[in-house]
Amino acid sequence: MEGERRAYSKEVHQRINKQLEEIRRLEEVRGDLQVQISAAQNQVKRLRDSQRLENMDRLLKGRAQVQAEIEELQEQTRALDKQIQEWETRIFTHSKNVRSPGFILDQKVKIRRRIRILENQLDRVTCHFDNQLVRNAALREELDLLRIDRNRYLNVDRKLKKEIHHLHHLVSTLILSSTSAYAVREEAKAKMGLLRERAEKEEAQSEMEAQVLQRQILHLEQLHHFLKLKNNDRQPDPDVLEKREKQAGEVAEGVWKTSQERLVLCYEDALNKLSQLMGESDPDLLVQKYLEIEERNFAEFNFINEQNLELEHVQEEIKEMQEALVSARASKDDQHLLQEQQQKVLQQRMDKVHSEAERLEARFQDVRGQLEKLKADIQLLFTKAHCDSSMIDDLLGVKTSMGDRDMGLFLSLIEKRLVELLTVQAFLHAQSFTSLADAALLVLGQSLEDLPKKMAPLQPPDTLEDPPGFEASDDYPMSREELLSQVEKLVELQEQAEAQRQKDLAAAAAKLDGTLSVDLASTQRAGSSTVLVPTRHPHAIPGSILSHKTSRDRGSLGHVTFGGLSSSTGHLPSHITHGDPNTGHVTFGSTSASSGGHVTFRPVSASSYLGSTGYVGSSRGGENTEGGVESGGTASDSSGGLGSSRDHVSSTGPASSTGPGSSTSKDSRG
């Protein structure tokens, strides 16, 4: 029984341990899940996921529409192939029926006349193209000047920022000095107040001591005067004078007594007088009192002498104290004047510092106002131009205001948007049959007055048609090696197409009669129209511009693509669509600022010429990557024009497009 209980308890403990381990494992899993949930619930990632989902949904819809359009185009190509086969069978059957030599000669004459007409048209178009290349070179120089102006503006902006920083530092130092001067001034005021109170107390105390000393001096002077009066000789008594006269009369009469008698009588008279004065008849007591009085008078005399000495000493002390008081008052006045002077100097310095601080503050506020106005204008221009803010959102996050360091980024995006809008405006002017030169100059916002007076002569290209097998790509800006390989392929394909065209013309001259000359021209137009891909709904694909135009009298087809094909999900909220039933359909969608937008021009006649300029206004490196321009056209564009365009892709500086590699002579077309 005990063993079963132990086994059961052991089994229960094992189960509990397993459950605890499972609980810990589940807690770790729960922590990982919470971390993943918090990461998934992050605002930025949710926004990115939502934008990616929207972009994917939009791309899927565009893919379905493109597939439908591809199927329709394949059906159209099959129908056109059937028509071509029918026309070829009809031509072959008709050539079997008609073998007249006059018809063949007439057909040759008409073909030669048609060739001369086309050559004349080609010469005119090549002249326009050469003029456009010259204007493009001039515009590149102007663009370089504008870049230099932009660098100067950035230098001035940096200098102003340094000056503002210096002014901030100067204002802070002035504020510190003014606060320290104010503290020193307050401390000096407190010390002056204490010294003033102390001087007032000392003055009151000295006045009280002077009054006490004056009273003592007055008392001593009165006592001294009294003692002087007392010590003066007494005036003779009238009785004594009378007695002396009486004695003199007795002596003269002979009645004068002896000296003894006279002495006794004198003593008696003296005793009688003393007894009368003192009120004492006993001579012993009278003598004793007299001695006491004499001793007392002598003591008083000694005391008066001592008091006189003390009086002289006190007078000397009073004189010294008065001199010390006068010197103390003079030193106090000097110290007070010195403190007033120091206070005035400090006040002047404080006023000067305050005025300087106010001036610097006013200047700083002025500069700050100009800077805020400039930022507001840049923000307004950025909003009105509908610039792409995805790169700014990625870099700055959730900031809604423009900082001082963000002005260069906003200006670069505005410059990029301006180049795009000018290109779009030039394309619209070209589609509305404006002057070719004006439309070319509008690409960079220039006019005919800005052209140089001296232009170097250029060699015109031999043709403006697309070479067979040329395909425009709008995936990304191609590198130098890719452009070189593509140019080599285009040259080979063009040579093969030229040889095949000559063979076809020779065969057609031998077979065709005079009645099928018009059909031959229409057949050539139909054959050239199958090279490009028409688009029925270009607005369904965001970030691109597709144009398809077929003209019977000109036989031309233009294709223009602006696109921002990047992985960034930030797009402008709106797109612009311009169309014309006669000139083709154009759609301008939003572009992304985080990668190079792509622009492709595919002209085959004089009506579409903008893509053959070979201009690229941006470099591929860095954050400010702008849309590249890929030009595809004739053999001359493949051999020389694209070479110059390749140079533009590799560098932002202007490249010479007037060299011999940009076009070939008319004599080399045979």
Swiss-Prot record:
GO biological process entries: cilium movement; outer dynein arm assembly
Keyword Isomerase appears in the UniProt entry: no
Biased composition, class Low complexity, residue ranges: 650-670
Superkingdom: Eukaryota
Keywords associated with the record: Cell projection, Ciliopathy, Cilium, Coiled coil, Cytoplasm, Cytoskeleton, Disease variant, Kartagener syndrome, Phosphoprotein, Primary ciliary dyskinesia
Coiled-coil region: 9-155, 183-224, 302-381
Keyword Cytoplasm among record annotations: yes
Annotated tissue distribution: Expressed in nasal epithelial cells. Highly expressed in testis and also detected in lung, brain and kidney.
Main location: cytoplasm
Database matches in InterPro entries: ODA-DC/CCD (IPR051876), ODAD1_CC (IPR049258)
Residues annotated with Phosphoserine modification: S517
Pfam families the record matches: ODAD1_CC
GO cellular component: axoneme; cilium; outer dynein arm; outer dynein arm docking complex
Bias type Polar residues, positions: 584-596
Location(s), subcellular: Cytoplasm, Cytoskeleton, Cilium axoneme
Region ranges (Disordered): 454-473, 526-596, 616-670
Subunit description: Component of the outer dynein arm-docking complex along with ODAD2, ODAD3, ODAD4 and CLXN. Interacts with ODAD3. Interacts with ODAD4; this interaction may facilitate the recruitment and/or attachment of outer dynein arm docking complex proteins, including ODAD1, ODAD3, and ODAD4 to ciliary axonemes. Interacts with DNAH9. Interacts with MNS1. Interacts with PIERCE1 and PIERCE2; the interactions link the outer dynein arms docking complex (ODA-DC) to the internal microtubule inner proteins (MIP) in cilium axoneme.
Disease annotated for this entry: Ciliary dyskinesia, primary, 20: A disorder characterized by abnormalities of motile cilia. Respiratory infections leading to chronic inflammation and bronchiectasis are recurrent, due to defects in the respiratory cilia. Patients may exhibit randomization of left-right body asymmetry and situs inversus, due to dysfunction of monocilia at the embryonic node. Primary ciliary dyskinesia associated with situs inversus is referred to as Kartagener syndrome. Unlike other forms of CILD characterized by reduced fertility, patients with CILD20 do not appear to be infertile.
Similarity section: Belongs to the ODA1/DCC2 family.
Entry function: Component of the outer dynein arm-docking complex (ODA-DC) that mediates outer dynein arms (ODA) binding onto the doublet microtubule. Involved in mediating assembly of both ODAs and their axonemal docking complex onto ciliary microtubules.
Protein name (Swiss-Prot/TrEMBL): Outer dynein arm-docking complex subunit 1
Taxonomic source organism: Homo sapiens (Human)
Upper taxonomic lineage: Eukaryota, Metazoa, Chordata, Craniata, Vertebrata
Gene name of this polypeptide: ODAD1
